[in-house]
UniProtKB/Swiss-Prot annotation:
Keywords: ATP-binding, Brassinosteroid signaling pathway, Cell membrane, Glycoprotein, Kinase, Leucine-rich repeat, Membrane, Nucleotide-binding, Receptor, Repeat, Serine/threonine-protein kinase, Signal, Transferase, Transmembrane, Transmembrane helix
Keyword match Lipid biosynthesis: no
Listed name of the protein: Brassinosteroid LRR receptor kinase BRL1
Residue stretches in coiled coil: none
Endpoints of the signal sequence: 1-29
Transmembrane parts of this sequence: 826-846
Catalytic activity, EC: 2.7.11.1
Annotated binding of brassinolide, by residue: Y678
Gene Ontology terms: biological process: brassinosteroid mediated signaling pathway; hormone-mediated signaling pathway
Reaction equation(s) it catalyzes: L-seryl-[protein] + ATP = O-phospho-L-seryl-[protein] + ADP + H(+); L-threonyl-[protein] + ATP = O-phospho-L-threonyl-[protein] + ADP + H(+)
Domain of life: Eukaryota
UniProt comment concerning the protein's domains: Contains two pairs of conservatively spaced Cys (Cys pair 1 and 2) possibly involved in forming some heterodimers.
Length: 1214
């Protein structure tokens, strides 16, 4: 049948298109191609440091030149075509704003490779004109940004490979040609969910798809469209939710590599279907939130696996499986960072024929390594650290694995003589030995290096090794890291070790080493980065050779007996980040050249004998510290809060391989009753050019004025200049220290007033100007009124909150500290007080003797009663040595309770039995007590109390007991008995908001929106009262829904105010989360400064408000994975999905939906990442007031705002 004319025309057109596509393009002049390449060079290459494009010159190669085919990096097709077919400029260090127009105009260009340069800019201009012959494009490892335009490479119909990895691309997308086989967009900043979904929907022919290390969020799409994929990598993104059921079961048959590590995937995978994994060789599901009571048995179908990684899920538990024995191809098995328990199965040793790496670290495994592991003849890396293994398996089993290169057994319970000799004899290839944090003793073998010539790392910290450091360690020519800290070593540091040519880390702190530090540092190379030999007994001076070590990052010589001055030349150490010379006997001047160290963020010179003035040049590096991680080493910071008892603001330790409980025994900790320990893995990360963050020059003999230039250090968090002889005024420029958390200027001779600008320092949580000659009012703004009076003591000219009001004459005339008249009056007053006290003491002695005689007969009866107290509850009692405990009175603040005793509390709680226990938290256990008169109270028994700080406890209780407000839970009384501390509170019928919202089974009432609104405003009112109306002002420090209690009328009562500060003074080793609050409520800035502020309370209140709006918990792995409520809400708002935030039970009334959005807006303002942009609690109340103006209800009932206080009766508060 003849075709119709239109069809014939169309067929002819298609034929013509095919012919044109297949026919060679008409040749273009060589000069035109050269001009295009030169145009690219002019537009894109601003810097060519190595002259890589020097050959790009017309006429190069002589008269018969084939330019540009003879140019470096340019390849042409063979004759007769002869056109440019490839441009490869990879790794040439070229820099400039990339413009691809000219290159994409080359019609025969098939391969473009610009990998590993410094090109920047975006690709919005990159739109090749058809026909496009490109087959491979690689622009990876540059600095591109912006979004991918839809037109990017769109006309390239034969494109097979695109690599844009390791840039800064943020989103966008481009249509895939059906010919595409490989796409690598890894290590960018891609967050576009559309691009993610499009990548999975358009990957029909793609075999290699790598989207790892981006910012993709949401759920993982199905793989159904990716029928040809062999490698899929979406690791290290922000994806969440459960895994798609068919991810493996219906995966393409060719899939060999699947990596979803480092996301927030959750859910139980114990029954997950692995039916489609027959050809998988690599499976990595590590570092998610997956759970199972065993390793998923479905994995038995994946018998071709060569790599299986399930580390870091933390919820995988149970015994290690034995079915892995059948995995004959397995070469790497990593199950670290989970909750696996029990012994290591003997059967696992049977799969060792080919296994190269085995990582079972950070679980809860017990016992020893089975003898069957001696068969692991290919094993090179064995990591069993962070378990509870014991026994002599190192000598009997590990030492027989001759192929071993890395052995990591730290943080176990291995005891006995250190096994280095048998390891050296049996494992000659060892490069890494890590036996830290065990209980090994004995000496370090002297001939280690002759047996282990390849040894790179010797890590033996936190053991009980003794003897001396053998000089023969200097024969380990490849040794890079030595860590012998926290042992019992004595003697000198051998010069041979100092001379090691490749040494990077030399860490030997907390031993008994002595002598002088050899002055041969970096004499055989400049590789040394870490020199931490603090807290030994070194004498002599700081070696001058230290200034040759130009790669030094961390230097800690503190806690020794070094003398002399700091040698010149430190200013040359441009990589130096941490310098600790504190607690020595150093003298001379503080080196001004330290301000030339552009990376210096931590300078601690406290407790020496430095004299002279503070050099203004120290601030010279402000704004010069480059962005990025300054130090990636593990650290511990011991924050000192003991004032004059322990000098300095705190101590930073290198903390690799040390148990926290061992550190707690360290003299710097247990001699300081108010020291806190914080740990981390990085010291600081700057997003912009930064400055020093820690500067401690306290306890020296510095004189002169404080340089105003220190105010330029905008990232400074700790500044301690206390206990010197400084004079002059506090610089006004200190108001620019926007990151400051601790500022100590105490015990100097400063005069003048406190600059009002210091009130604007939102992070300031520790401020001490006591013992100076300051005058004038304490600024009423910001944090300054929240500090106790002791921080302003002995400045007789200061006034205002928390001191007496200005205009109030002090008892001895208000003369400045040191005034002769003032001293005479003080002496006279002291004599009178002394006489009166003597008389009083005599009277008390007579009364006490009489009482002792009367009570002696009943003591045994009373003691027997105490010993018979029930012990069925969780409470424990420390009453040894307490006389007459039952008759101890409860100090009360309410008249009806004035005759309450400890015996009454025992009776009302049945000896604090489990039946009366109604709750427990970070500060203690709470019991319900019904007194004889029928009244009901709640009794909190404090935990973490060490018996120290009696005066602080009493003073704090007396302060808290006087605070009365209808939205605060009143403290009715307190009792001290032995080492125990009891607090008596008013009982709240409906319990905590946390239970009512999140535990439906225990909740006594259901909260509708009107009730939640009432609670939101009531708790805000209580918090605002603490911040603005109490004297001194109080920071809550642990605001959360479990500290919002509900009374009979469902009125909110904020509880535990003042408790965090009290426990801060009593407990010596609280965790970071206890100090700062509760996870999920902690403001982001706390992890920079470890300081609590009123704006931190505002953030925590914002979380409570989100709980009321959403009904969700702040942290819930089943809802948010590794994210939290705040992060989830911010993501919902960003994606215009705010309606999904609200509790479904609140959205029934459409008329009230607009109000929910208004309350959500207030919550988001409270949760701003920048503290200075959060409202105060007074401003929050004002916003609530504004919302109520058009409302029929009046749940704010009379609330009014004055200049600085809250008043609920219409009269200005004190």
């Amino acid at each position: 049948m003849a075709a119709s004319p239109p069809f014939m025309a169309a067929a002819a057109f298609l034929t013509l298109v095919v012919v044109l596509f297949r026919a060679p393009a008409p040749a273009i002049a060589v000069g035109e191609e050269a001009a295009a390449l030169l145009a690219f060079r002019r537009a894109s290459v601003a810097d060519d440091p190595d002259g890589a494009l020097a050959s790009w010159v017309l006429g190069a190669g002589g008269a018969n030149s084939t330019a540009p085919c003879s140019w470096d990096g340019v390849s042409c097709a063979p004759p007769p075509d002869g056109r440019v077919a490839a441009v490869d400029l990879s790794g040439m260090s070229l820099a400039g704003e990339l413009r691809l127009d000219a290159l994409l105009a080359l019609p025969a260009l098939q391969r473009l490779n610009l990998r590993g340069n410094a090109f920047y800019g975006n690709l919005s201009h990159a739109a090749p004109s058809p026909p496009c012959a490109l087959v491979e494009v690689d622009i990876s490892s540059n600095a591109l940004n912006g979004t991918l335009p839809p037109s990017f490479l769109a006309p390239c119909g034969v494109l097979r490979s695109v690599n844009l990895s390791r840039n800064g691309l943020a989103g966008g997308g481009f249509p895939f040609a059906p010919s595409l086989r490989s796409l690598d967009l890894s290590r960018n900043r891609l967050a576009d969910a559309g691009l993610l979904n499009y990548s999975f929907a358009g990957c029909h022919g793609v075999g290699y798809l790598n989207l790892s290390a981006n910012l993709f969020a949401g759920r993982l799409p199905e793989l159904a469209a990716c029928s040809a994929v062999t490698t899929l990598d979406v690791s290290w993104n922000h994806m969440s939710g459960g895994l798609p059921p068919g991810l493996v079961a219906t995966a393409p048959a060719n899939l060999t590599y699947l990596n979803i590590a480092g996301n927030n995937f959750t859910g139980d995978v114990s029954g997950y279907d692995f039916g489609g994994c027959a050809n998988l060789t690599v499976l990595d599901w590590s570092y998610n939130g997956l759970s199972s009571t065993r390793l998923p048995p479905g994995l038995i179908n994946c018998r071709r696996l060569e790599t299986l990684e399930m580390s870091g899920n933390k919820l995988l538990s149970g015994a290690l499986p034995t079915f892995l024995v059948g995995f004959s191809s397995l070469r790497r098995l990593a199950l670290a960072g989970n909750e696996f328990t029990g012994a290591i199965p003997v059967e696992l040793g049977q799969l060792c024929g080919r296994i190269v790496e085995l990582d079972l670290s950070s679980n809860r495994l017990v016992g020893a390594l089975p003898a069957s592991f001696a068969k692991c003849k290919s094993l090179e890396v064995l990591d069993l650290g962070g378990n509870q293994l014991a026994g002599d398996f190192v000598a009997s089993v590990v030492s027989t694995i001759a192929s071993l290169r890395e052995l990591r057994l730290s943080f176990n319970n291995i005891t006995g003589v250190n096994p280095l000799p048998v390891l050296a004899a049996g494992c000659p290839l060892l490069e890494v030995i890590d036996l830290g944090s065990n209980e090994l003793d004995g000496e370090i073998m002297p001939d280690l290096c002759s047996s282990l010539p390849s040894l790179r790392k010797l890590l033996l910290p936190n053991n009980y090794l003794n003897g001396t450091v053998p000089p023969s360690l200097g024969d380990c020519a490849n040794l890079e890291s030595i860590d012998l800290s926290f042992n019992l070593l004595v003697g000198k540091i051998p010069t041979e070790i100092i001379r090691l040519p490749k040494i990077v880390d030399l860490v030997m702190w907390a031993n008994g080493l002595s002598g002088e530090i050899p002055d041969v540092l970096c004499s055989n190379g400049t590789t040394l980065e870490t020199l931490v030999i603090s807290y030994n007994n070194f004498t002599g001076s700081i070696p001058r050779s230290i200034t040759k070590c130009v790669n030094l990052i961390w230097v800690s010589l503190s806690g020794n007996r070094l003398t002399g001055s700091v040698p010149g030349g430190f200013g040359k150490l441009q990589k130096l980040a941490i310098l600790q010379l504190n607690k020595n006997l150093l003298s001379g001047h503080v080196p001004a050249e330290l301000g030339s160290c552009n990376n210096l963020i931590w300078l601690d010179l406290n407790s020496n004998s430095f004299t002279g003035t503070i050099p203004p040049q120290l601030a010279g590096q402000a704004g010069l510290v480059p962005g990025g991680i300054v130090s990636g080493k593990q650290f511990a910071f011991l924050r000192n809060e003991a004032g004059n008892i322990c000098p300095g603001a705190g101590v930073l330790f290198e903390f690799f391989g040390i148990r926290p409980e061992r550190l707690a025994e360290f003299p710097a900790v247990h001699l300081c009753p108010s020291t806190r320990i914080y740990t981390g893995t990085t010291v600081y990360t700057f997003t912009n050019n930064g400055s020093m963050i820690f500067l401690d020059l306290s306890y020296n003999g510095l004189t002169g004025t404080i340089p105003g230039s220190l105010g330029n250090m905008m990232y400074l968090q700790v500044l301690n200049l206390g206990h010197n002889e400084l004079n002059g005024t506090i610089p006004d420029a200190f108001q620019n220290l926007k990151s400051i958390g601790a500022l100590d200027l105490s015990n100097n001779q400063l005069s003048g007033g406190i600059p009002p600008g210091l009130g604007g320092l939102n992070f300031l949580a520790d401020f001490d100007v006591s013992n100076n000659n300051l005058t004038g009012p304490i600024p009423s703004s910001g944090q300054l009124t929240t500090f106790p009076p002791s921080r302003y003591d002995n400045n007789n000219g200061l006034c205002g909150i928390p001191l007496p009001p200005c205009g109030h004459n002090p008892p001895w005339g208000g003369r400045p500290r040191g005034s002769p008249d003032g001293k005479r009056k003080v002496i006279g007053a002291s004599i009178l007080v002394g006489v009166a006290l003597s008389v009083l003491i005599l009277l008390l002695l007579l009364v006490t003797l009489c009482k002792l005689r009367m009570n002696q007969k009943t003591e045994e009866v009373r003691t027997g009663y105490v010993e018979s107290l029930p012990t069925s509850g969780t409470s424990s009692w420390k009453l040894s040595g307490v006389r007459e405990p039952l008759s101890i009175n409860v100090a009360t603040f309410e008249k009806p309770l004035r005759k309450l005793t400890f015996a009454h509390l025992l009776e009302a709680t049945n000896g604090f039995s489990a039946e009366t226990l109604i709750g427990s938290g970070g500060f203690g256990e709470v019991y319900k007590a019904k007194l004889k008169d029928g009244s009901v109270v709640a009794i909190k028994k404090l935990i973490h109390f060490t018996g120290q700080g009696d005066r602080e406890f009493t003073a704090e209780m007396e302060t808290i007991g006087k605070i009365k407000h209808r939205n605060l839970v009143p403290l009715l009384g307190y009792c001290k008995i032995g080492d125990e501390r009891l607090l008596v509170y008013e009982y709240m019928k409906h319990g905590s908001l946390d239970v009512v919202l999140h535990d439906k089974a225990k909740a006594s009432v259901k909260l509708d929106w009107s009730a939640r609104k009432k609670i939101a405003i009531g708790s805000a009112r209580g918090l605002a009262f603490l911040h603005h109306s109490c004297i001194p002002h109080i920071i809550h420090r642990d605001m959360k829904s479990s500290n919002v209690l509900l009374d009979n009328n469902l009125d909110a009562r904020v509880s535990d105010f003042g408790m965090a500060r009290l426990m801060n003074a009593l407990d010596t080793h609280l965790s970071v989360s206890t100090l700062a609050g509760t996870p999920g409520y902690v403001p982001p800035e706390y992890y920079q400064s470890f300081r609590c502020t009123t704006k931190g309370d505002v953030y925590s209140y914002g979380v409570v408000l989100l709980e009321l709006l959403s009904g969700k918990k702040p942290i819930d792995p089943t809802e948010f994975g590794d994210n939290n409520l705040v992060g989830w809400v911010k993501q919902m708002v960003k994606e215009n999905r705010s309606s999904e935030i609200f509790d479904p039970t609140l959205t029934d009334r459409k008329s009230g939906e607009a109000e929910l959005y208004q309350y959500l807006k207030i919550a988001c303002e409270c949760l701003d990442d920048r503290p200075n942009r959060r409202p105060t609690m007074i401003q929050v109340m004002a916003m609530f007031k504004e919302l109520q103006l058009d409302s029929d209800s009046d749940i704010l009932d009379g609330f009014s705002i004055n200049s600085s206080t809250i008043d609920e009766s219409g009269e200005k508060s004190m």
